[in-house]
Amino acid sequence: MSTLPEHISLWGELADVDHELRHVDVGGVRTRVLRAGSGPDLILLHGTGGHLEAYARDIAGLAADFRVTAYDMVGHGWSDLPDKPYTIDVLSDHLLGLMDALDINSAHLSGESLGGWVTAWTAAHHSDRVERLVLNTPGNIADKPEVMVRMRESTLAAVRDPSDETVRRRVEFLFHHKEMVTDELVNLRRAVYGRPGFLQAITNTLVLQDPEVRKDFAWRPAWVGRVTAPTLLLWTDHDPTGGLDEAELLLGWLPDARLHVITDAGHWPQWEKPGEFLRAHRDFLVLGKDPV
């Protein structure tokens, strides 16, 4: 049986770790960035409607081995919300612009859900900028309509009415163990969803759940096969957005990939199983071996 996270607060996780939280100008987009640690660059990307605190339980541990950069993607968190569709190429360009602004020539990339989609696209189209790649529950590789509908409807319901009930339901969707969803995490997400202009911003993100828009960026072997970076697929046994059959698809498409399954977790293994998440990253990115 799972227990509540062993932390006082989101920021309590970073209480004894030197870090910097600031906004960076990325091509005119004011972008919220958190940085900690030293060593090889590792950039963390959150999912749809998310924010950098998705990695609150991981940054301190990762900072022991990496110069960690977590950020709010354009149209997310407390970054700017320009009114345009946030398609995968737009999100990838924002990532590359952030790397330029921070003088990061190349980096390891670890992306969760939508963030995984963005990192894979970036690795396929800008291979010189990516060292190694971690795709963390990238979700709905098979473009299942029911998953797209659920993602769109649950997210819009929470943003249109960011009450404790609707937002908690949206956050609980990410977890296998719902009891691990804290009031603080829900209230943080409510604050994001309540930002002026965020309803239009999330609508601009959810265009990716429209099959007609999605088809131009959908996971397909033609572009996935161009990813030359060694890749770790981090999957779970309770991810509501995609099962192990979808991991097998990517294993067949990616030239240099391996799979590690985190058990007893949902769509947010970095929160539900931070120790195993950290070990997998350290094994693959630092030691150059497959996680066990």
Describe each model-derived feature in a short phrase.
Residues 1-42, 65-66, 104-105, 282-292:
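Alpha/beta-hydrolase fold catalytic core
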Residues 25, 29-78:
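Conserved HGGG/HGGXW glycine-rich cap/lid loop of the alpha/beta-hydrolase fold
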Residues 34, 56-60, 69-114, 118, ...:
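Active-site loop/oxyanion-hole signature of alpha/beta-hydrolase fold enzymes
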Residues 120-124, 131-167:
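Flexible "cap/lid" loop of the alpha/beta hydrolase fold
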Residues 146, 164-225:
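Conserved alpha/beta-hydrolase catalytic His-Asp/Glu region
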Residues 227, 233-235:
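Short beta-strand/loop motif that positions the catalytic acidic residue
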Residues 238-242:
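Acidic catalytic loop of the alpha/beta-hydrolase fold
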Residues 256-292:
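Catalytic active-site module of serine/aspartate enzymes centered on a nucleophile-bearing elbow/loop
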